[in-house]
């Protein structure tokens, strides 16, 4: 090694720093390969795997190759990484054994001893093979021998630390392969050294950071250590990792400042609390500001120096990462944070110094970004930089106000001295910006030099900022800057220029509902309008401010007094009115009508009471309050009757008005509800709660800007309506808050009156509510006299007195003495006169006016009712009793039903009348004194009863049953029931079986009356009866009149019993009881009970040898399906017409169920020849062929499977070939002529023994 080499120059902290690699051995050899080495080393990337699970990265390695010297090796405690040699290389091209032993081996030994002394283990021996040198040497060992000797002597445990580079200056494949192997080894060793040394450095750095709570710990010292790591990452071109180091330092320092503000301060922070003496802004045009770095190292830096240097390094790295817009974002945060940190640390700052520093820093950042981006990029990223423009504008404005550059008279001597001090604190301009025409330093110095220069610079910045905000859609921010601009113009006595900006800002704040900015802007606008002489606009704004509760009471009173002062001044032009909207002066809360339904007749008095809520802070004397009313006549005036108006108007007469939404828009009330959610952030290690809070998920919906095409302020040009109809109240004092004001008017013309506009006059100032909403109307009517008659109950009942209410609405007619109602009497309806009847007179508001006795005079045809005297638009009410005579049903109304089967009769009766009462209408004609025409009314009465009758038999004994059903809701008392024969029968007696003379009948219930029929001779063929019963309401006291009884007439025919039918079932022979599935014997006995009667003389009657007989058809059916009839179930017999004549019929039946079973039904029919014209027309299922019928049990065939069935009705036995032939006809015998003596009899059937499933019939 050549010890006479010159020492290395000191390290310069620039971006050209590279990792240091020392070179020992043959320097000339290294010099020859250096160009190729420095070119080839960074060409191929290498994967760098770092510790602590950090993601691997591909890096290109570069190195700074320097001559090896012992002074370069780090001493104990030295943490400098930039001067740290990461690798030591020894170069030799020795191929001679003698030379190796004489010099090279000793040199290698010394080199390794020095490295071992300094604990350096990162080294490499490079043996360069040169073919030309071999040819010149005759006695040389093979190459492998020298390599093996070096490896044995120095690398016996690390053979990979010795590499061979073959002919590095030649261009051959062997040379290229040698270079590739060498470069790979070199990169690998370098990365291993980086990983090892950086890991150790990071561990030491973390150890130092963990000692930050110990006394004597210095942030500046730690700053230098971590920045050393950042320099190494930057040297390796790992700019992201380098930026992370500065961000960690930034966060650590910020946390200490916050803790200091909370009372937990560190001692070393006192170094940064020294007063600020220089405010020359950020320096971003140098890679490293060595001056500020050295001041930090010496612990002499101020807070601004530290923040400036830290941000300059972050800016440099962000620009290398091509993230210039993040520079702007971070710069804005930095400037705001620095202002707050100076306050927290209570650092002494001269007035305006911080404004200068912020202004210079904003422009410095903007110019630095402009220097690395083209115009298109800048224009498309205005959103990132506009905040800096706005902040610079704000600080320049503050400097202008501070230095007296905005005042009307210009700066004074004190302002000038302050300006000189601020410019002195800037110091001399930096060399890197000295030749820049528009440097931040020159701009600030020029702006503070004169009033004109300041105005130029401030207006340029303001207009540029407004234009930028507008271009990106941030209208609110643009209006805020415009508002500052308006304040500037007001100070410059140019209100005409300020108004447009104030109006724009106010419009935006109103659209978005910002209460406090609205108030502040209106105050500025009021001052502007006052200077411009805009009286009407100024009064409108003053009224809004006087009602604004965000102002103090004194401010509100001031603006209210401005309005009152103007109103008290005499007007130059009499009659001139200044019309202002009312919502700021007072609000209409509610309105109340008296009468409450807002309906009044012509000539009546209507009161309208309104509640006005005064917004003014002091009592205000109002000369008059006027309500303009619009009069209209309904086209469909027939609807506007008093009855219609009364039913369709509000009952309480109170109308509430929605509160005014000014100064906020309607859209604010329709914003979506807040969607608030809890947020928890827990530690991933132990799940402990770190932070909690509330987040709003729909903030983008709540804070979005809402455009409005028109101004949301109430326009001052409100039209004042002039009309013939007004409600007026004069000389009213409106106290702050709610005030009751009453208007009175007398109705003159019928129609609808709509309240349109509310006005209040204070001198020549009129406050107007242009539209009263919701719509408020009152109606004036002129009514014709009317008569209404209606029952007091839901329905009128016939036969008992019922009360009817008469209502006379006088309308425009006046009832005079002697006026009466003339009622024509109906035949079946009586009007009952009572001495105590009285008439009551009511006003149209249903208040009782008078009461008088009712005089009623009756004659045969007319009933006269004298009316009491009553004025117009009153109501007369009185009640009368009427009685409708109950009408009896038509004769024989149900007599034709008695000859038919009982079920069919009941069905028809129900279908005809159902459960409804029979009604009767009575029409009455009434002559009224106010009309030449008669009024016809109809009263409907309902018969409360429904009556039916039936014939009952017990052998030859006969009974008549009458059922009276009460269909009404009242209870009645029945008495004196009678049943009489209206025919000519003298030997017939009706014996009543009801012994009670009086019997109650309740609502929806029935009462039955029974009489037995007795006769001594032959009974008559028919019986004509009349049933009558007296009735009266059960709840009434003794009536003043006697009521007519209720009557019912009916007719009974063919009621004498001719035949007795008896059926009996016998078990099979040898059995005591019938069994299921076994054939049993059915015996039917038909007995004639009388000799020949008049009713027997028909086509079925035949005569032979003075004996008469008739043909009957019997049928056995089982409707309950308990029995199966085997064989033929019907037949025709010839029955002698003589008393006690008997015919027996035998057939077999089979029980289908076990238990007590009722006997099958046996029916009898008259068998009429086909030519009979008097027989009933039955359906085809009732036609029975004579040849197929048999009454002889022994002549029947044995039953088969097809004939074993249950019979439910008469079945046809004719074949298809007989369908077209004339058939005999059947006529059912009336129910009174046949008596079934076995009806209700049951037979015990026991189950068969072999049945697995037992079915039992229970009846």
Curated annotation (Swiss-Prot):
Recorded hits in InterPro entries, A to Z, give: Ig_TRAPPC10, TRAPP_II_complex_TRAPPC10_C, TRAPPC10/Trs130, TRAPPC10/Trs130_N
Domain of life according to the entry = Eukaryota
State the compartments where it is located: Golgi apparatus, cis-Golgi network
Give expression by tissue: Expressed in all tissues examined.
Residues with Phosphoserine modification = 708
Query: What's this protein's family per the entry?
Result: Belongs to the TRAPPC10 family.
The name this protein goes by in its record? Trafficking protein particle complex subunit 10
Q: Which gene encodes it?
A: TRAPPC10
């Amino acid at each position: 090694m050549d010890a006479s080499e010159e020492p290395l120059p000191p390290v310069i902290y620039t971006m050209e720093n590279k990792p240091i690699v020392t070179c020992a051995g043959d320097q000339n050899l290294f010099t020859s390969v250096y160009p190729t080495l420095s070119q080839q080393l960074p060409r191929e990337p290498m994967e760098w795997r770092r510790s602590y699970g950090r993601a691997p990265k591909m890096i290109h390695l570069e190195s700074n190759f320097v001559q090896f010297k012992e002074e370069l090796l780090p001493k104990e405690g030295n943490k400098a990484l930039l001067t740290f040699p990461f690798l030591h290389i020894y170069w030799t091209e020795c191929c001679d054994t003698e030379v190796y032993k004489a010099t090279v081996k000793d040199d290698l030994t010394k080199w390794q001893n020095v490295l071992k002394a300094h604990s350096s283990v990162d080294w490499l021996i490079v043996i360069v093979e040169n073919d030309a040198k071999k040819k010149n040497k005759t006695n040389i060992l093979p190459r492998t021998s020298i390599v093996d000797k070096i490896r044995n002597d120095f690398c016996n445990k690390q053979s990979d630390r010795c590499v061979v580079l073959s002919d590095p200056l030649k261009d051959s494949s062997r040379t290229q392969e040698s270079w590739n192997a060498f470069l790979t080894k070199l990169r690998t060793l370098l990365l291993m050294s980086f990983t090892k040394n950086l890991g150790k450095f990071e561990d030491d750095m973390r150890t130092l950071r963990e000692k930050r709570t110990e006394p004597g710990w210095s942030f500046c010292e730690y700053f230098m250590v971590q920045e050393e790591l950042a320099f190494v990452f930057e040297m390796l071109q790992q700019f992201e990792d380098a930026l992370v180091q500065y961000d960690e330092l930034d966060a650590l320092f910020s946390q200490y400042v916050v803790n200091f503000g909370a009372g937990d301060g560190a001692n070393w922070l006192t170094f940064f609390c020294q007063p600020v003496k220089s405010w020359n802004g950020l320096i971003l045009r140098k890679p490293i500001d060595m001056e500020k770095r050295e001041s930090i190292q010496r612990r002499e830096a101020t807070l601004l120096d530290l923040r400036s240097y830290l941000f300059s390094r972050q800016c440099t790295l962000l620009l290398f990462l091509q993230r210039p817009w993040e520079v702007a974002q971070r710069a804005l945060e930095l400037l705001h944070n620095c202002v707050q940190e100076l306050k927290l640390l209570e650092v002494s700052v001269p007035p305006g110094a911080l404004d200068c520093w912020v202004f210079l820093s904003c422009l410095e950042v903007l110019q630095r970004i402009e220097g690395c981006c083209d115009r298109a990029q800048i224009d498309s990223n205005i959103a990132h930089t506009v905040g800096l423009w706005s902040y610079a504008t704000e600080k320049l404005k503050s400097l202008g106000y501070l230095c007296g550059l905005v005042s009307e008279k210009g700066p004074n001597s004190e302002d000038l001295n302050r300006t000189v001090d601020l410019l002195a604190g800037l110091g001399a301009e930096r060399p890197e910006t000295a030749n820049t025409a528009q440097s931040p330093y020159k701009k600030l110095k020029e702006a503070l030099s004169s009033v004109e220069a300041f105005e130029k610079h401030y207006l340029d910045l303001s207009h540029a900022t407004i234009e930028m905000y507008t271009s990106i859609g941030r209208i609110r921010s643009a209006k805020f800057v415009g508002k500052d601009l308006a304040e500037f113009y007001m100070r410059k006595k140019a209100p005409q220029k300020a108004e447009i900006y104030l109006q724009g800002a106010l419009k935006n704040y109103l659209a978005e509902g910002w209460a406090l900015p609205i108030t502040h802007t209106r105050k500025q606008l009021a001052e502007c309008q006052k200077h411009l002489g805009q009286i009407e606009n100024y009064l409108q704004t003053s009224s809004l401010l006087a009602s604004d509760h965000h102002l103090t009471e004194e401010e509100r009173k001031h603006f209210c007094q401005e309005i009152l002062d103007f109103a008290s001044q005499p007007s130059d032009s009499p009659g001139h009115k200044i019309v202002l909207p009312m919502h700021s002066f007072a609000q209409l809360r509610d309105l109340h009508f008296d009468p409450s339904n807002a309906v009044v007749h012509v000539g009546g008095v209507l009161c309208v009471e309104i509640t006005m809520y005064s917004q003014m802070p002091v009592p205000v004397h109002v000369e008059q309050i006027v309500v303009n009313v619009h009069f209209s006549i309904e086209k469909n005036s027939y609807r506007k009757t008093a009855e219609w108006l009364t039913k369709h108007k509000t009952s309480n007469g109170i109308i509430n008005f929605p509160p005014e939404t000014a100064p906020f828009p309607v859209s604010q009330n329709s914003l979506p509800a807040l969607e608030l959610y809890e947020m928890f952030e827990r530690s991933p290690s132990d799940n402990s709660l770190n932070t909690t809070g509330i987040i709003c998920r729909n903030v983008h919906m709540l804070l979005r800007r809402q455009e409005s095409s028109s101004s949301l302020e109430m326009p001052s040009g409100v039209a004042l309506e002039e009309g013939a109809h007004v409600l007026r109240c004069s000389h009213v004092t409106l106290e702050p808050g709610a005030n009751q004001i009453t208007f009175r008017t007398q109705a003159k013309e019928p129609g609808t009156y709509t309240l349109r506009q509310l006005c209040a006059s204070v001198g020549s100032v009129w406050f107007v509510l242009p539209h009263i909403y919701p719509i408020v109307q009152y109606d004036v009517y002129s009514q014709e006299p009317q008569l209404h008659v209606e029952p007091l109950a839901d329905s009128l009942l016939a036969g008992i007195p019922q009360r009817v209410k008469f209502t006379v609405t006088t309308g425009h007619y006046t009832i005079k003495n002697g006026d009466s109602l003339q009622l024509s009497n109906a035949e079946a309806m009586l009007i009952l006169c009572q001495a105590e009847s009285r008439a009551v007179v009511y006003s149209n508001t249903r208040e009782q006016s008078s009461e008088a006795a009712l005089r009623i005079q009756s004659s045969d045809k007319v009933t006269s009712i004298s009316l009491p005297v009553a004025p117009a638009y009153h109501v007369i009410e009185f009640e009368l009793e009427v009685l409708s005579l109950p009408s009896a049903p038509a004769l024989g109304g149900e007599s034709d039903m008695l000859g038919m089967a009982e079920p069919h009769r009941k069905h028809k009766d129900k279908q005809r009348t159902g459960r409804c009462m029979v009604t009767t209408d009575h029409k009455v004609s009434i002559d009224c004194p106010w009309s030449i025409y008669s009024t016809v009314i109809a009263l409907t009465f309902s018969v409360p009863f429904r009556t039916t009758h039936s014939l009952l038999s017990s052998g030859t004994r006969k009974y008549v049953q009458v059922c009276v059903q009460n269909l009404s809701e009242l209870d009645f008392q029945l008495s004196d029931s009678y049943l009489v024969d209206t025919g000519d029968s003298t030997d017939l007696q009706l014996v009543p079986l009801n012994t009670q003379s009086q019997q109650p009948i309740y609502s929806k219930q029935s009462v039955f009356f029974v009489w037995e029929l007795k006769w001594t001779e032959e009974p008559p063929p028919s019986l004509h009866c009349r049933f009558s019963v007296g009735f009266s309401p059960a709840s009434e006291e003794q009536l003043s009149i006697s009521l007519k009884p209720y009557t019912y007439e009916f007719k009974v025919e063919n009621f004498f019993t001719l035949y007795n039918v008896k059926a009996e079932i016998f078990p099979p022979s040898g059995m005591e009881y019938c069994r299921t599935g076994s054939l049993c014997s059915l015996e039917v006995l038909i007995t004639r009970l009388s000799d020949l009667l008049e009713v027997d003389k028909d086509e079925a009657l035949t005569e032979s040898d003075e004996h008469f007989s008739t043909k009957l058809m019997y049928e056995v059916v089982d409707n309950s399906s308990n029995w199966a009839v085997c064989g033929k179930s019907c037949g025709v017999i010839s029955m002698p017409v003589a008393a006690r004549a008997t015919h027996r019929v035998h057939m077999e039946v089979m029980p289908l169920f076990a238990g007590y079973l009722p006997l099958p039904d046996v029916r009898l029919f008259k068998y009429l020849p086909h030519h009979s014209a008097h027989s009933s027309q039955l359906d085809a299922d009732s036609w029975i062929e004579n040849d197929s019928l048999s009454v002889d049990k022994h002549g029947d065939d044995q039953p088969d499977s097809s004939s074993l069935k249950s019979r439910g009705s008469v079945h046809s036995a004719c074949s298809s070939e007989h369908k077209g032939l004339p058939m005999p006809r059947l006529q059912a015998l009336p129910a009174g002529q046949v008596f079934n003596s076995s009806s209700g009899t049951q037979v015990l059937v026991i189950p068969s023994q072999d049945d697995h499933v037992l079915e039992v019939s229970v009846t």
